[in-house]
């Protein structure tokens, strides 16, 4: 019995060229009706963070709707060594600016010292949803940042 083998050739598939997508300026720039207000809130929070950028505290980002203030001093927290510790962040989200205040995450009693109006904005362990360009709220955030910085300084994290 004779077997016939036929060579099967594959057609050449054209190579795909990568198409670069334009990166949006802000994560939700075209999805939120209140976006112009959110940009103002973001810029105000960023201004509150600037005085604390000194020594090992470095500001990262500031564009694209994200800014982070991080202490680059190696620390030990709850028995774990960390190369850095995050302090405060602001991120433009859909419908609000996330004000991430990490001192409250590691020191729950700090929440009792913060103003009740600011605490109403707390929606997670350390994330405050800031939706209004409210001067009173900015004063409360400024006080919170100072308290948090003093706490970090007390612990030797700055």
Question: Which ranges hold each PLM region?
Answer:
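Charge-dense, helix-prone N-terminal extensions
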Residues: 2-158
